[in-house]
Regions:
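A solvent-exposed interaction/effector surface
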Residues: 1-160
Length: 160
């Protein structure tokens, strides 16, 4: 595996309105059912429209890696709708600078890539100002093999 430091890049993350769903899951495999079979139909029922460019990500609230993953799913929508039991709407402000790295492969190995990105931020004196976003770009829905899956890990920072 290449050195993460050679693959880190910076970008801004736009202010958007998001449909969100938070719950505890036992493993990342549950996302394969949660997104298309629970979140998707509820967003459709509420009349959500997802504008281009599409932007969805997950945020984890656990302090340590393990089971009972406290996760929140965010998907950008054109406008705020009325909250439901499953879906809450939030507006997130722009993130002027995020350190990013692309993780390829299974979700179970993302904690190692995240740890390397976090270490890179600390080593280079960046102040982390919010939780990391795990933006699932390529996955089971559009790729043949797990090795082709790509998740962009976005770490909001403040430049010193």
């Amino acid at each position: 595996q290449e050195n993460v430091m050679e693959k880190v890049f910076k970008k801004s993350l736009p202010s958007r309105i998001f449909a969100t769903h938070r719950r505890k899951i036992d493993s990342y495999q549950e996302l394969f059912n949660l997104c298309p079979n629970i979140i998707g139909p509820e967003m459709y029922r509420l009349g959500c429209e997802c504008p281009a460019p599409e932007y969805c990500f997950t945020v984890e609230y656990n302090e340590e890696y393990g089971v009972d993953i406290d996760i929140e799913f965010f998907e950008a929508v054109a406008e705020r709708k009325e909250d439901s039991e499953l879906i809450k709407f939030k507006e997130l402000p722009e993130v002027p600078v995020a350190l990013c790295v692309n993780h390829y492969g299974a979700y179970e190995h993302m904690p190692e890539t995240f740890a390397e990105l976090f270490a890179y931020a600390e080593t280079n004196g960046y102040e982390v100002i919010d939780r990391a976003r795990f933006c699932h770009i390529d996955g089971i829905w559009n790729k043949e093999t797990v090795d082709e899956w790509m998740t962009e890990i976005q770490l909001p920072i403040k430049l010193s």
